[in-house]
Amino acid sequence: MARIRLVEHAAGAPGLRWFGLGPDLKPSRGLLKLRRLLHKHAFWAQQRTTADLKRMLAGSTVAVSLWRGKRMVGFGRATSDGIHRAVLWDVVVAGDLECRGLGWRVVGALLSAKAIRNAERVYLLTTNRSGFYQQMGFEPASP
C-alpha cells in the first residue's frame, strides 16, 4: 500500500485552488479530486461546485489534505481569528480508509496550526461523528 502523505496548504490554499497542486507542489488536479472526495464521501457536500470549493478554500485559514499516491483520501479546513475562536469544517476521509487514524491525522494537523492552536476555543459541527470528536476531547456544546 502506498504511504499516505499530509499536505498542509497555505492560508486560502492558493496552490490547490488555482493550480490543483498536491504533494510535492506538483499539479495533480487537486481541486477536481477534492470535489470527487466530497461528493463521494460527504453527504453534506454533494452539491458543491468547483466555484463553491474555490470560494470555500479562499476563506479558509488552514487547509490540509491527505494523499495516497495521486488520490486525495482526506481533507479538512478551519477558520479562525487567531486568538479567540476557531471552527473546524469539512473534515472527510475516504470511506474505504476509515478507522485507520486518518481522521485523527487531519484533525491533529488542523489543531496544531498556529492560527488554530492559539485560539481560546475551537468549535465544530458534526451530523453523525460526535463519538469520533469526543474521543479527541471535544465536548457537546451546552444550550
Predicted regions and their residues:
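A conserved beta-strand-loop-helix scaffold within acyl/acetyltransferase catalytic domains
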Residues: R48-V92
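Short amphipathic alpha-helix that is part of the acyltransferase structural core
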Residues: M1-R48
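Short alpha-helical functional segments enriched in proximate histidine and acidic residues
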Residues: A113
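Conserved active-site alpha-helix within GNAT-family acetyltransferase domains
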Residues: I116-P143
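Conserved acetyl-CoA pyrophosphate-binding loop and the N-cap/start of the following alpha-helix
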Residues: L97, G101-A109
